[in-house]
């Protein structure tokens, strides 16, 4: 059975004229063009440019329309041979999981699909900031709903920094509500979250880069500490924040030149962050020692060996932690706690942790 119709996903890049020649060809030859806006504010210059270049109507659609997808797929399947439908979006179309799911549905219906790739904020962030692309790790979106307490963002950033990797934070913008997360709001949210977890992931002195409206004529780049950036105004969205991990000297030189700041102010943030075990093991060791001290006077001499082994495990935990052997440190604390608990299970003494 032959395929029925075509669904072409066209990336528009980062702004006006960011679409490739191939993308323009697909837009011009389409029967229907849907232009998707839901994470980036409407940009009149882009709309004007596309209307001029393709000479046909653009149908602006939102997130719900694309997620539902039925109208798009129905349009592609109309007529004996189907129609050519283009879904255009800023950035690269396959960065959005919604598009990938729609593509799979189209293929199952016998609709031919094609993807025209383009630049994204994720790729442009490295080029714009002067950081090495391969050193970026998991990218995170900061949403309006969670900006007050950024637990998931905090933990992902923590893991990235432990690896010495850079982190890209994409700040959400809801085109329907006309609201988004500003860089100062995201920074304030991270600092509030640090107060809860206290792992040294971020502080007022954390060095970061703010990238606003990349790919546009009014693009803005800023660098500084959280304390400095939290006081700045960054204008219209979209915005993103880069928090560097370990910096190669060539990255430091590039950041200094691009952002126009003294090289001595450019710094990575990985050295300041505490490993999870560095936070937990000292607390567990101290607590276990307090409990041991409280029950020791109640124990008969025959349990001296148990007490001695508890102390040995606690010292092992501290030594393993100092040598970066976090898993063994956690296990050693667990063994120490288990020995003390065994005294309770045996009915020797009652212990209140």
Descriptions of predicted regions:
Residues 304, 337-353:
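Short, charge-rich amphipathic alpha-helical segments embedded
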Residues 1-112:
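Class I S-adenosyl-L-methionine
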Residues 304-308, 327-334:
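Short, charged, amphipathic alpha-helical segments
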Residues 2-10, 113, 120-268:
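Beta-strand/loop-alpha-helix module characteristic of Rossmann-like adenine-cofactor folds
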Residues 269-308:
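Amphipathic, heptad-repeat alpha-helical segments
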